[in-house]
Amino acid sequence: MKVRASVKRICRNCKVIKRNGVVRVICSSDPKHKQRQG
């Protein structure tokens, strides 16, 4: 999980979602692409 000020999709499988007011990126193909805004 990377914590970043600016979250962007890294690959085409990444999805940007908002969970409890926190913007997150989840990825089915590569778990290293997981990000959270913070």
Swiss-Prot record:
Q: Which GO terms describe its molecular function?
A: structural constituent of ribosome
Q: May I have one GO cellular component term?
A: ribonucleoprotein complex
- Any matching Pfam family: Ribosomal_L36
- GO biological process, alphabetically ordered: translation
Entry keywords, A to Z? Ribonucleoprotein, Ribosomal protein
Superkingdom, natural source = Bacteria
Family from the record: Belongs to the bacterial ribosomal protein bL36 family.
The record's section on HAMAP family has:
Ribosomal_bL36 (MF_00251)
Q: What is this protein called?
A: Large ribosomal subunit protein bL36
